[in-house]
Amino acid sequence: MHAEVSRITLNIAQRSRALRDDYRRQIDEMSRQPVHRSQLSCGNLAHGVAACGSADKSVIKMMDSANIGIVTAYNDMLSAHAPYAGYPEQIKSALNAIGCTAQVAGGVPAMCDGVTQGQPGMELSLFSRDVIAQATAVSLSHQMFDAVLMLGICDKIVPGLVMGALQFGHLPTLFVPAGPMTSGLSNKEKVRVRQLYAEGKVDRAALLEAEMASYHSQGTCTFYGTANSNQMVLEAMGMQLPGSSFVNPDTTLREALTTEAVEHIAKIARTGRQALPLAEVIDEKSFVNGIVALLASGGSTNLCIHLVAMARAAGLVITWSDFDELSKVTPLLAKIYPNGSADINHFQAAGGTGLLFGELIKAGLMHGDAKVCFGGTLDAACIEPFLDEGHLQWRPAATASLDTDVIRSADKAFAPEGGIRLLEGNLGRSLIKSSAVAADRQTITAPAVVISHQNELRALFERGELDRDCVVVARFQGPAANGMPELHQLMPILGVLQDRGHAVALVTDGRLSGASGKVPAAIHVTPEASKGGVIGRVQDGDLVAINVASGELNVMVDEDVLAAREQARAPAPRSTVGRALFAFNRNLVTDAESGGCTLFEAPVLVDEPIEAATQSVAYGHCVS
């Protein structure tokens, strides 16, 4: 293993020891005193099987065959989740064929951030992750199941499902993906039309035509945003079958992979011979693997919030410093839009996850000995599925890229460091997605343009007041202010200004869509403005400096002057479109670096760094 990866992994384990021990005690208690249908009263069990057919009733009450719980995020408005409509019946049929059963344990909400971008509903988006975690726990609380299949893909859905599933870590769990839509209008062309619309050079009809040509069918959006980053991370953590993430919906291979996942879950269920509880798989190694895969592929910054919350649900404490330190030793091996012109289908065709993970394991950057939920270890999961006369088979993944413009080997990386960096300074701590930003754009010092709402920037642009170098400071967009919405609507305007030759950047305590790219954006600023952060004392015209190479984020104002300034007043919270129901979330939520979470308190960090010399003893690997 690479010395730094081992050190960071050990630091996570050490700082998490008390929380992790508590988590394991909770799981051990559920294992020793089975939270299971065998412990239900006759009345309880009768209610649990009342809606089943007579054959399923007979199997379930015998207790010796697996009954699988399905937690589904299906709805037919969300393109990525629409394919799930028929999955429960396919799952039940496949299980019945091997003498097992399944029940839909529950459904969870699934927002589409593409629908809510720039709309009031976006203020519910981050909080929906915690609602999904709670809904997952409610679904599994009936104690009817021997294992779990999760049907979910998109932005907050996967993190929420993982967080909920980890509370039932005594149960084996697998995710079942549905795959990306086929390639439509290129992402680059879509963004070009968006910028033309922002400038008033094309009308709404032309914009809608371009958008609908890009988002055109069932399946995940093809850009490498949060949804596809979720899929990359799930596979890297061993939570779904190898090579299954990016197979298109409504194909024979997709259907075969779903059946294969069903057969695997029956084998590793509590009733099976190869029982493999989720809590035995998900640990500090699996989280480091997920982070490294994210960084090497230039994935979404949203995962820097979600992985922290997911880890906390497993009794582990991950910080942004872990992301930053891993990024410094993880080369960028993939170029997928917005980091390049290729989409996720091109990535799959170039070699996909098996090639990427194989390169990272070979470089000592991923823990190849980490367990995976379907049995075995990650290094044995660098394989890819294919059909041979209609039957699913597996073969070794490609060991050389089939398109070096999309995936490269570690020794010929696109960049020596990963795609996400930590920035620090008198404005606080922040993250920047550097992989999509040109090298000559990664340092900027320019006057601040301060806004408290996305619409303010459009008004300034339309009045011609932004035709200059500037750093847009979007404050009061953090978790406690308004739920930390994504501010993707700002990017077409900033992209236009950049294309006109101006030096522009964004600094915000809010989030950005995983699709955001070429404009440098210091996001997730902590402390946020509504919690007294310095970002709330920045004024129009202040010079703001971003330097990715040195990891600095500062407002160039004397500290005494800053301290003497009155904190800006937060806008009054809005209560329409359901936002009144989430007031308690805004009051309870932790800061962005603690996961923007309402379910767990922010941990008190006491780091005792591990020296490199001890690493080989702890993990049994040679330090290289």
Label for each model-derived stretch:
Residues S139-L161, L174-V176:
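A short, small-residue-rich loop immediately preceding and capping a beta-strand
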Residues M1-A66, T72-D76, A80, E89-V108, ...:
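Catalytic or ion-coupling anion/metal-binding cores of large enzyme and transporter domains
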Residues A105-Q143:
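N-terminal small/polar loop signature for handling phosphorylated ligands or for N-terminal nucleophile
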Residues R129-T136, Q143-V148, R458-L466:
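Contiguous domain-boundary segments centered on the initiation and propagation of an alpha-helix
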Residues Y84:
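Glycine-rich beta-alpha loop segments
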